[in-house]
């Protein structure tokens, strides 16, 4: 009998006989797959009680190596496959079985691409698979961080809902609505987006305890994050009644603009959906699906329930008892669960049990001070802010990229950091944090029972630790929570000493990292930024909506940057100074912060430009004589006058704000504030105008101008808006797929007239030309994947990759 190549290579260490070799291999692999096959004797699926450890991501080369390994396994003879059930271990830690074992354990094998494509009946799943089977295929050597893991070869099934839908617990259902009865201590899990209404009993959702009321809560449950668990806490006659209703916010439309938004929501009906839709029809679709286990998902994604550590629950209970006196700072290493804990605590504080006997309900809301510019909760990256929340939040950050609703919450004040990490300018970061804390104290005058939650970034080592200890000692906190029991000691000891000096309680909790991350931090930032520019919330509408048009198709604001009636009074850069001759090129296509200068004190005044003492006294006396009606105009003129002394004019007449040669001093937070972000589409030197795309409400801009504020644009070092460049390409691809589906459907139905085929071919030709033009934009390259696995799965697909615009001494384009 011929030996395999792998057997020949390890012959020296192998047993003597073939029987002994087979027995040794089986004993060696038995412990490796013990957790996977423990329950195969009784069930066809492997159900795990707790989430496994975080798995490493595989690159494209590893995926190709795995596919080659699978092909070698398939070529083994039937005789050897029948004698042995060999388990071959791949580098990424996943387990690949031979053909016989995979046929017996169909629940944990990888679905074939064509089989998965045929199982998806909804357009989202179909479009996602046609575009990219893995969500976003990783391009080798990507430097911008936009890579995502390939599909795992093994999917471990997890229990999600603790109830199974049947005729006894389904109160009523139709094509849009499902009302279920949940017994106490049991729970249900859904994927998608829906409106939740508690009719009877009390249920808990992401830390919030929702009591019966006419209020409806919007819940977003995508596959990128652990799914919310709706659990019955107390009920009427031992059960609670909850109604779930489909909602059409438009956020699913973003799948046509970016592959990052594909395979996020429900796709096709699950077994529980088919049961509840039996009376309506199997063709009906809701915007949510009920899942009993992760195996019910038609797309076979890594779905996990959102569990809460017992120590977390105890800490939240203790902190919430402080009510309005609570001022807590949450810190810890990266990926330790700070955002999840803060969201749970926020929702718990916003949903206390009503006390009618005391005639008291929480109407003061909760203040949320977000000091993490890399992964903020309610604004895009690069900002720190103070938000005032009135309602619990059920969804990841890209489902609420801004707050413009008085009922749900508003942004009190924000400052532009211009980077994803505060280490770029820690002094400016500390000043911004102190100013936001002053705004919170001002808020207490109106809402005296408003607690405060401070979210500190994962910058907890080195200089970041010094900043954290300074904030603990200076902000007047009541509690500090550190999210790691593993230390390290060099971090815990300084935090403990700072808390002791400030007489602040320090609580150390275990970290709870996210399992099976399907999007990287850079991808989540890109998704939140894209959602920010596409979200709209008209006046009088309780929930936001998302628009599907690419930002390049939106009509921009045309603003003058020179002349008497200019809308922008200056442009400044952070972190590093840009040569004036290159300022125009660096601004086109860049993300900038729209900052309002409230007084001249925000500007750095060089000593050479300081006015003489007698002039200051005359100005002071003149200020006393100014009427209140003219005070706003006087303040505006003074600010513009100081801006003039700091600006230099470029060859395009752009007002470039500098505080000296080679220096770039940010605006002082006490006299400036951030209004929002804008995307500069183009600069026209002939008309001296800027074309800006921004979601900032026009009412907010008008209000700032009426107060006499001067608007400036601040360019930082944020991630390049590659998503904006690629939106037209993906929109064209999505339109082509829709047209092809329509043509295929008409042919199958036998509907059509003579001459329709020529019209269809002309239409497809126009769409192909649109795709070609969108693909040929600057800094965008289509990379063809000629991997063996991709050739077998489908025809060669075009994968795009964006290249950053390289500046002087830049290596961003090296290797492409």
UniProtKB/Swiss-Prot annotation:
Listed Basic and acidic residues bias regions: 97-107
Protein task: Polynucleotide 5'-kinase involved in rRNA processing.
GO biological process per UniProt: cleavage in ITS2 between 5.8S rRNA and LSU-rRNA of tricistronic rRNA transcript (SSU-rRNA, 5.8S rRNA, LSU-rRNA); rRNA processing
Zinc recorded as keyword: no
Gene Ontology molecular functions: ATP binding; polynucleotide 5'-hydroxyl-kinase activity
Binding positions (ATP): 332-339
Gene Ontology cellular component list: nucleolus; nucleus
Keyword terms: ATP-binding, Kinase, Nucleotide-binding, Nucleus, rRNA processing, Transferase
Compartment annotation: Nucleus, Nucleolus
Pfam families: CLP1_P
Encoding gene, per UniProt annotation: grc3
Name the record gives this protein: Polynucleotide 5'-hydroxyl-kinase grc3
Top-level class of the enzyme under EC nomenclature: transferase
E.C. designation(s): 2.7.1.-
Feature: compositional bias, Acidic residues: 121-130, 614-626
Biased amino acid composition, Low complexity: 11-37
Family under the similarity heading: Belongs to the Clp1 family. NOL9/GRC3 subfamily.
Region (Disordered) location: 1-132, 603-626
